[in-house]
Curated annotation (Swiss-Prot):
This is Innexin inx6. The gene is Inx6. It is a multi-pass membrane protein. GO terms for biological process: intercellular transport; medium-term memory; monoatomic ion transmembrane transport; phototransduction. Residues 43-144, 242-302 are extracellular. Belongs to the pannexin family. The chain crosses the membrane at residues 22-42, 145-165, 221-241, 303-323. Uniform expression in the imaginal wing disk. Expressed in an outer layer of the pupal developing CNS. Also expressed in pupal retina: cone cells and primary pigment cells. Coiled coil: none annotated.
């Protein structure tokens, strides 16, 4: 048995790169291992023997067992009387005179005719007792042969979301986070991977990251849908499993094992009835009332008690995870706080500035990277992104970022340039006279355009005939004369 279950431990082993959150792991991976382990237990014939044993003559033993295994067994379901109590409750509180009259009947068939409810109460087991053919209701145990197949189908059902996400994920996290998940990293590898991650997140993959995150949210929603589908499936297969078994589980905390045996026997009876027709030599049919023991139900009642609690637990977690996902999508401030938990005290303003230009998809990929890389490297990655954002702002056109000095008024221009020596080139000298109506950004920009020249003369030459440099004061005095 251990050799059969051992390969499942490799499935639960933590991978180098994790692509599932803890709730997803519980819902898919852990549930699959539990269900497959239960399947192996039920199929272990050496521990529980034959799946069915029927009481019959030695000559017909194999035939009867094969017939009842193939055609199925049944029990007599508990009926609710007019006061709302079950058959065994009715018998416990039956009037003394009625019970006395019943005990005076010598035949069991007469007892059935007199009081079938009480006759079934004193029968062999819950659901096994005398019946009136064609009148008494029967509940066939058609699931018994297929329990291990049901568990196997459930394991495949719960595996589907994780398989779908693995296909959609396409090893993106493995490519981003390989070689940097350890506590100690080679310096060259550290720097190389840091530069690659920085370039990746600076490359603006927002639409791809958005699709990536939405696909993961869809797989989480699929987990919830599968949990609900599983509830319905078990309730149909096991004839009201969720309602009946809650009473059995309620008996465990108070150690009421009689109630436990009674309630579990209504879903997983250990003893059941089987009916077979045997024809005589002349063709007259005879009905054989056969009693069968169902050994696997001893294990089924324990397995499904555990699965009852586990399925409720993971369904609740899956619903809470969907609510959390909706909250994270709608609340940027919550995304900021969650990301800061992986940054070891990085200033909040820096993180906010990095996330200001990032959407939910970018944040989701960053969170996935944070749980797969070295914490120091992840913090340095965010610092690099912050530095690149500031550098990008500084390398934008100067008029958009750098402040300029206040432009002097036109009246102050003569005094400002009174002692300045001007260039010999007339075309460059023209640009030194400043248009007072120009904005300060246009004045600071050298590469984009020149400042508009002040309209004076068509050809402005500040050079004397002997190449003497004329001062600005002299130029203004002569021009106004």
């Amino acid at each position: 048995m251990y050799a059969a279950v051992k390969p499942l431990s490799n499935y639960l082993r933590l991978k180098t790169v994790r692509i599932y959150d803890p709730i997803f792991t519980l819902h898919s991976k852990c549930t699959i291992v539990i269900l497959l382990t239960c399947t192996f237990l039920l199929s272990a014939k050496q521990y529980f023997g034959e799946p069915i044993l029927c009481l019959s003559s030695e000559r017909q033993a194999d035939y009867v067992q094969s017939y009842c295994w193939t055609m199925g067994t049944y029990i007599l379901p508990a009926e609710v009387d007019r006061d709302g109590g079950s058959s065994w409750e009715y018998a416990l509180y039956a009037p003394t005179s009625t019970a006395a009259e019943t005990f005076n009947v010598s035949s069991l068939r007469a007892l059935v005719a007199q009081n079938e409810q009480y006759a079934r109460f004193i029968s062999i087991a819950e659901g096994v007792g005398p019946e009136t053919r064609g009148v008494t209701k029967r509940m066939y145990l058609r699931y018994y042969q297929w329990v291990f197949m049901i568990l196997l189908f459930q394991s495949l059902l719960f595996y589907f979301p994780s398989f779908l996400w693995k296909v959609w994920e396409g090893q993106r996290m493995e490519q981003l986070c390989c070689e940097v998940g350890d506590a100690l990293i080679v310096e060259a590898t550290y720097r190389t991977r840091l530069q690659m991650l920085t370039r990746y997140f600076r490359a603006q993959f927002a639409p791809i990251h958005w699709c990536y995150s939405i696909k993961y949210a869809f797989c989480e929603l699929l987990n919830v849908f599968i949990s609900i589908l599983n509830f319905w499936l078990m309730d149909v297969v096991f004839n009201g499993f969720w309602y009946k078994y809650i009473h059995a589980l309620a008996a465990i905390p108070v150690y009421d094992w009689n109630l436990w045996n009674l309630m579990t026997s209504r879903v997983f009876p250990k003893v059941a009835k089987c009916e077979m027709f045997v024809y005589g030599p002349s063709g007259t049919p005879n009905i054989m009332d056969i009693l069968c023991v169902l050994p696997l139900n001893i294990l089924n009642e324990k397995i499904f008690a555990v699965l009852y609690v586990w399925f409720l637990f993971i369904a609740l977690l899956a619903i809470m995870n969907i609510l959390y996902r909706l909250l994270v999508i709608c609340c940027p401030e919550l995304r900021l706080q969650l990301l800061r938990t992986h940054l070891n005290g990085m200033p909040k303003s820096h993180v906010r500035e990095v996330l200001a230009s990032a959407g939910y998809g970018d944040w989701f990929v960053l969170m996935c990277v944070s749980i797969n890389v070295n914490p120091t490297l992840f913090r340095e990655l965010l610092e690099q992104l912050y530095a690149k954002l500031n550098q990008a702002r500084c390398t934008e056109p100067v008029f958009a970022e750098q402040p300029c000095q206040q432009v002097p008024q036109l009246a102050q221009v003569p005094q400002l340039f009174s002692h300045a020596k001007l260039d010999r080139c007339p075309s460059r000298n023209c640009s030194l006279l400043i248009d007072p109506t120009a904005d300060r950004h246009s004045i600071c920009t050298e590469s984009s355009h020149r400042v508009t020249a002040m309209p004076t003369a068509p050809t402005l030459n500040l050079m004397a005939p002997n190449d003497e440099i004329i001062s600005m004061d002299r130029f203004f005095h002569e021009s106004h004369a």
